[in-house]
Amino acid sequence: VNTNRDSEGLGGSDPCCNLCSTAYLVDVIHHEQINATFANSVSSRFPKDESYLVAVSGGRDSMALLHFLQSTGYQNLVLCHVNHCLRGAESDADQALVEEAAKSLGLPCEVHSSDVAAHAAASSQSIEAAAREIRYRFFSDVASASNCKQLILAHHADDQVETVLINFFRGSGSRGISGMDQISQRVVNQVELTLIRPFLNLSREAIDRYVSKHDISFREDESNAEEFALRNRIRNRLIPTLAEVFERDIQPAVLRSAELAHRAEQWARNQEAELPRKENGLDVSSLRNMPDALRDRLLLAWLRESGIPDCGFSEVAKITEILISESKPAKTNLPGNHHARRRAGILFLEFPDAEGENPK
């Protein structure tokens, strides 16, 4: 599967795109050689003498990723593993495998253990959301300590399909339906990470063949077959049902839709530079005079660049309500004990103090 994205240096004739190019990855996987053009293009964007963090769970995909990176000459790797403490001895065995792999390769390995279930309960989040939050906080901590801000992840095309479907049924706009980018930026705890997903255009089947061919050791997460997690239900129930209803593999169509949404998203991102900034916020009059669709996009971009967690168009709607209101100064609540306030013709954000209270 090749979605041939042409933004952020990921497609078209840009020679820097090939780290994430399906054609080159397939060449590596099936021919056991690195094409000279591939090697040169990788070095031009992601030099092999730089350091990279690699998220390694011990599962099939991340162990294949680790093998791939090593076989293509990436030696300055820091393995990052999170023990979610969800599966008892099984979680500990995952950690042991990753640590053993790091030792055998002579690579540093950073490990973090966290009671994800307890964190989920305390923060009123799903297990999936809590685990993701813990992982990225850990990644940002390692990135800050090691001064290495490039993180390589093992997401593949099947993961992309699941992500697109989840976002679609949540009512996401083009940003959500476009799925994950092969190369993107994410700010966590004021640390800007560059996320790199070399396998995003490869199917799970292709990775399975690679693992089998190279006899790569990995741990099978049996919880992937359980249905408590939304992503598992999407993978195990919804996708097979859709394939049966449409009598075809739905992956190409979903990825094609994601690509079209990505192009629309690309245009919208170009408009985000037009944020009507004023003092420490945004100019209310300018926002009121914008077309609704553009204003929604700009407000969402503003929230995300400001580090407001878990924000979407529902938060944008709340801000729009106080924005267009003719009442005196108005305020609305946002996730993470943040607030948006309109006062004296300026829309601005209030942030919690170190204790998470008393927004300032």
What is each model feature region?
Residues 24-237:
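Core alpha/beta nucleotide-donor-binding catalytic domains of modification enzymes
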Residues 124, 128, 251, 313-316:
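Short, structured helix-loop boundary elements
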Residues 241-253:
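Inter-helical turn/loop segments and adjacent helix faces that build the functional surface
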Residues 146-148, 245, 310:
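Surface-exposed helix-capping loop/turn segments at secondary-structure junctions
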Residues 2-10, 14-62, 78-84, 114-116, ...:
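AMP-forming adenylation/ATP pyrophosphatase catalytic core
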Residues 143-157, 252-269:
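Electropositive, surface-exposed helix/loop patches at the edges of structured domains
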